[in-house]
C-alpha cells in the first residue's frame, strides 16, 4: 500500500497567473503532434522532447531511444507516452536520478515534466516520499497522470517551461548534479573507512583534510552555532583606534568686551493720571 501524497500549499509563481507579455524570442515554442504534417515536424517534436527531459547535456546519439521514436512516428503512442518513456529510461535513471538526492531530483523532474520549479520544501518532501515508496517509475507516472500535467500539456504537447521571466531556461542550468554527488564520490574513494582511519594511512596536508570534509557538513554546522558578538574584541579594537587620536584645542580667549544693559526711561501708559507713578 503506497503512502498518499502529502498536502502542501502552492507558492506564488509566474506560471500560476495569466501573462500579457509581448511575444519575443523567449516565448516558448509549442510542439504539438496533431499539427505535424510531415516527418520533419515529427523530428522536431522528438528533438524537443529530448531537449526538455534529457536537457542539453545528455542529447547524444548513444542516449537516443529508438523504440520510443519508432512508436511515436507510427502514432502507436502519443506525446505524453513518449515523455513518460524518456522519464523511465535508463539514461534518466543513471544520469539524473542516481546523481541527486530525492529532494533535488523532485525539483529537477518538476521543471522538466511540469515546466515549473518546486513550490517549496513541503512539496519536495511530499514527492520524495512518493519516490521512496513507489520508486522513480511511480514518481514519473504520478506526474504525468496528474491533473496539472493534463491541463497544461494534455496528450499531444511536449512539456515546456511555463512563463519564464529573466532566469535561464531550466534545460540550460548547470550542473545536473550538486555537492551531494561529489560527497558520495568522496565516501566511495575512502572505501568505507572513516575520515580518521583514512588519515592514518598516509601523510596528508591541511588541504587534503579540508577536501575530505563534505562542504554541506560545514554549512550545517555553521547553522547550528548561535551567533554571538565578541564584545571584548570590539572594545579592544575601538580602544586601539582612539588611544592615539589627538583632539584639537578648540577653545579661545574672549577678546570682545561684555555688553552691559542699563535701564532706560520708558513712557508707560496712563502716566497722565495724577497720583500714578509711571516713571
UniProtKB/Swiss-Prot annotation:
One cellular-component annotation, GO: plasma membrane-derived thylakoid membrane
Pfam families: PBS_linker_poly
Localization (cell): Cellular thylakoid membrane
Any one Gene Ontology BP term: photosynthesis
PROSITE patterns: PBS_LINKER
InterPro entries referenced in this protein's UniProt entry, alphabetically: PBS_linker_dom, PBS_linker_sf, Phycobilisome
Chief localization: membrane
Membrane topology of the entry: Peripheral membrane protein
Keywords: Antenna complex, Membrane, Photosynthesis, Phycobilisome, Thylakoid
Domain of life: Bacteria
Every PBS-linker domain range: 11-189
Family: Belongs to the phycobilisome linker protein family.
Function statement: Rod-core linker protein required for attachment of phycocyanin to allophycocyanin in cores of phycobilisomes. Linker polypeptides determine the state of aggregation and the location of the disk-shaped phycobiliprotein units within the phycobilisome and modulate their spectroscopic properties in order to mediate a directed and optimal energy transfer.
Quaternary state and interactors: Part of the phycobilisome, a hemidiscoidal structure that is composed of two distinct substructures: a core complex and a number of rods radiating from the core.
Protein name: Phycobilisome rod-core linker polypeptide CpcG1
Organism: Nostoc sp. (strain PCC 7120 / SAG 25.82 / UTEX 2576)
Gene name linked to the record: cpcG1
